[in-house]
């Protein structure tokens, strides 16, 4: 159970407070309700570029990292298709340093040509190293537009193409900041050995004078129901042939999302999972195989990926893989397997709650989804899942007309 308090500033900033007297550290976590799905299709990669720009200094503080490091702290951030999340960890007695830094860059990020050019080059280099010049690196650049035809999930967080980052202007950057980086579009969580009233005082001191803005209205194109099997084969200089089966799955706020998560565990989370046992251990068709979900807020994907063993064809794999999926669709899962999966997810969630940063981030995420208390209800939702529900959802999702398959064929030197 993660206990928390909640309050809201007049400028629209939602604040969560989580008290933990057992740690000398504090976490300041800021979630901005903006991700790659909020970008224009002609100007992608901006949410991720902004993650980098936010460390380029603000008007009053030219170097973000140095003051935090002097206070014994560290910071980092991540961007997804749905959110951008910034976090600072530091000794509790120095928490005002983090509040000073975070509030100042929310108020007045430094828009200098030098900062834009430096961070643009960093992102371009990341694009090249991680997505263009790395084996299997461009998989998501190919798979997303295969699986999605209308929704902005059809491009990766890094961006649709490198030219969008290269051509980003100062006016583009300022407009993106003005639209998304303000109190009404943020959720702040303060976690650690700090009383609620002191948290309220400090947050009002540092954030209270930031001007209010209207939360942007999000109107995204709805992804049509997929009615046909899609496939694409690309050739790349990679060590082994690889495969990526993607299935559309329910959105994050639905009960079926949790059921699909357990189904992915049944298929490929561990060495005892169905796909690993059948395709790797028994048939030796693959050298690796995994199943997981993207965790998206809107309609996401269940992914099955892996690499073929030598001298195994995609056709051999395909027949065996669909046979495993058919078993899950038609046969009721045993009580023993169901219990094992639910016990495992309980253990994983309990372990995740051990870390102060994880608690702060999850509180922010669930507040964005509708109510921070959802983090405390999550385990009960998982534990209520039945074998009958898994069979029903598997029937809904694991069918050929709901699948987009990307094959990566190895070109031998």
Walk through the language-model features, giving the residues of each.
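M16/insulysin-pitrilysin zinc metalloprotease superfamily fold
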Residues: 57, 89-122, 290, 294-352
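An aromatic/glycine/proline-enriched structural segment found at the starts
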Residues: 2-5, 149-150, 154, 182-251, ...
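M16/MPP (pitrilysin/insulinase) zinc-metallopeptidase core fold and M16-derived inactive scaffolds
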Residues: 27-89, 155-158, 269-285
């Amino acid at each position: 159970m993660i206990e928390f308090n909640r309050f809201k500033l007049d400028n629209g900033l939602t604040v969560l407070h989580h008290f933990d007297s057992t740690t000398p550290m504090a976490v300041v976590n800021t979630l901005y309700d903006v991700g790659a799905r909020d970008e224009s299709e002609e100007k992608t990669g901006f949410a991720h570029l902004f993650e980098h720009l936010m460390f380029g200094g603000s008007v009053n503080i030219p170097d973000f990292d140095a003051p935090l490091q002097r206070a014994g702290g560290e910071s980092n951030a991540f961007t997804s298709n749905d959110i951008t999340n910034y976090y600072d960890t530091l000794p509790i007695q120095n928490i005002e340093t983090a509040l000073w830094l975070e509030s100042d860059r929310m108020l007045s990020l430094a828009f200098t040509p030098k900062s834009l050019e430096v961070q643009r080059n960093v992102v371009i280099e990341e694009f090249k190293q991680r997505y263009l010049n790395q084996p299997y690196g461009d998989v998501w650049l190919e798979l997303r537009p295969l699986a999605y035809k209308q929704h902005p999930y059809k491009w990766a967080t890094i961006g649709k193409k490198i030219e969008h980052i290269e051509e980003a202007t100062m006016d583009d950057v300022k407009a993106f900041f003005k639209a998304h980086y303000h109190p009404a579009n943020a959720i702040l969580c303060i976690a650690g050995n700090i009383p609620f009233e002191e948290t309220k005082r400090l947050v009002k001191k540092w954030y209270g004078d930031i001007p209010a803005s209207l939360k942007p209205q999000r109107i995204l194109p709805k992804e049509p129901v997929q009615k046909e099997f899609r496939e694409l084969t690309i050739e790349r200089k990679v060590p082994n042939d690889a495969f990526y089966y993607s299935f559309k799955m329910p959105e994050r706020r639905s009960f079926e999302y949790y059921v699909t998560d357990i189904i992915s565990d049944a298929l490929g989370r561990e060495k005892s999972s169905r796909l690993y046992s059948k395709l790797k251990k028994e048939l030796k068709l693959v050298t690796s195989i995994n199943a997981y979900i993207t965790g998206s807020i809107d309609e996401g994907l269940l992914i099955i990926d892996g690499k073929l063993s030598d001298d195994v064809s995609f056709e051999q794999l395909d027949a065996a893989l669909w046979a495993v999926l058919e078993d899950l669709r038609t046969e009721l899962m045993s009580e023993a397997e169901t219990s094992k999966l639910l016990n495992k997810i309980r253990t994983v969630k309990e372990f995740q709650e051990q870390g102060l940063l994880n608690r702060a981030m999850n509180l922010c995420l669930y507040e964005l989804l509708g109510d921070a208390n959802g983090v405390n209800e999550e385990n009960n939702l998982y534990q209520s899942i039945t074998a009958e529900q898994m069979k029903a959802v598997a029937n809904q999702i694991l069918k050929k007309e709901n699948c987009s398959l990307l094959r990566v064929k190895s070109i031998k030197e």
